[in-house]
């Protein structure tokens, strides 16, 4: 009774399958798509614009309490696509990290430093058996006095890149194909 070549490797997030896959990371990416929303971010010459869908999962919920766009500081924002609880946890930690950065260095945390911090944190979650990867893709947006508008995308595997335009969520590839035109 064979369970396939990936049998057993999806129970432990720190063990690679024979194909070189971390199933728990793949499940985190699937959780982002399963949230059923798509988010898009576009960087202009003097601005960053992000849009996302707003799906209220229950008729009894207050619509104003459902959001995927969060302020981190006066100059940084975070658009989180994926599991709501993971998003809120990540935003709380990002706000604390940004406040600590400002206290320690005396100036606001740049968007690329926050994106790197989120990516590093996400990558650490793939290394320890007592943690699980967050089911969220975060777009970090900000305006820098020297470099202008910035847009970064961080994923559950710990990757982060700067983008002119990007997308995350259920219709990510379709949105990226449209943005590339």
Q: Model-found features: residue ranges?
A:
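Long, low-complexity N-terminal extensions
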Residues: 1-181
């Amino acid at each position: 009774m064979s369970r396939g070549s990936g049998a057993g490797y999806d129970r432990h997030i720190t063990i690679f399958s024979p194909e070189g896959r971390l199933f728990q990371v793949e499940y985190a990416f699937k959780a982002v798509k399963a949230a059923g929303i798509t988010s898009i971010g576009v960087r202009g010459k003097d601005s960053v614009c992000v849009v996302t869908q707003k799906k209220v999962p229950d008729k009894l919920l207050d619509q104003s309490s459902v959001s995927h766009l969060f302020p981190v500081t006066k100059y940084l924002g975070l658009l989180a696509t994926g599991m709501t609880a993971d998003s809120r946890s990540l935003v709380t930690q990002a706000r604390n990290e940004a406040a600590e950065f400002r206290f320690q260095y005396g100036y606001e945390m740049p968007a690329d430093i926050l994106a790197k911090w989120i990516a590093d944190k996400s990558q650490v979650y793939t290394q320890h058996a007592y943690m699980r990867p967050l089911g969220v893709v975060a777009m970090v947006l900000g305006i820098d006095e020297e470099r202008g508008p910035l847009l970064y995308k961080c994923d559950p595997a710990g990757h982060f890149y700067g983008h002119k335009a990007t997308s995350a969520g259920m219709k990510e590839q379709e949105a990226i194909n449209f943005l590339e035109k």
